[in-house]
């Protein structure tokens, strides 16, 4: 009589699967903590001349815009450029912070693709 081959999961594979689930759970818990941490952060971005400051959370949620009186004197078009510069700076810093925090979260877990 021929023996059935089953699903190909030996004890070693089950152990690997169990470890993968544990790692996934660690990442999920860490991601929740990271989300909370990023939400509490305030990341500033500045225009090239420093007259406009944008503050975002670590999750890239806009918090505030501060415009110095000198920026108002430059006219609408220049002011728009300064606000855009400050927003891009804050966004870039926020993205870098998120990336760094995610690398810290996943380092040492030996996750494929990360």
UniProtKB/Swiss-Prot annotation:
It is found in: Cytoplasm, Nucleoid. GO terms for cellular component: bacterial nucleoid; cytosol. Keywords: Cytoplasm, DNA-binding. GO terms for molecular function: DNA binding. It comes from the Bacteria. InterPro entries: YbaB-like_sf (IPR036894), YbaB/EbfC (IPR004401). Disulfide bonds: none annotated. It holds the Pfam family YbaB_DNA_bd. Homodimer. Binds to DNA and alters its conformation. May be involved in regulation of gene expression, nucleoid organization and DNA protection. NCBIfam families: DNA_YbaB_EbfC. Belongs to the YbaB/EbfC family. This is Nucleoid-associated protein PCC7424_2224. It comes from Gloeothece citriformis (strain PCC 7424) (Cyanothece sp. (strain PCC 7424)).
């Amino acid at each position: 009589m021929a023996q059935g081959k089953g699903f190909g999961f030996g004890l070693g594979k089950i152990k690997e699967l169990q470890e993968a689930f544990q790692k996934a759970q660690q990442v999920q818990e860490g991601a929740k903590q990271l989300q909370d941490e990023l939400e509490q952060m305030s990341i500033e971005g500045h225009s090239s001349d420093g007259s406009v400051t944008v503050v975002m959370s670590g999750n890239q949620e806009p918090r505030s815009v501060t415009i110095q009186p000198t920026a108002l004197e430059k006219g609408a078009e220049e002011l728009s450029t300064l606000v855009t510069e400050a927003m891009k700076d804050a966004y870039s810093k926020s993205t870098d912070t998120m990336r760094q925090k995610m690398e810290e979260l996943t380092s040492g877990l030996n996750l494929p693709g990360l």
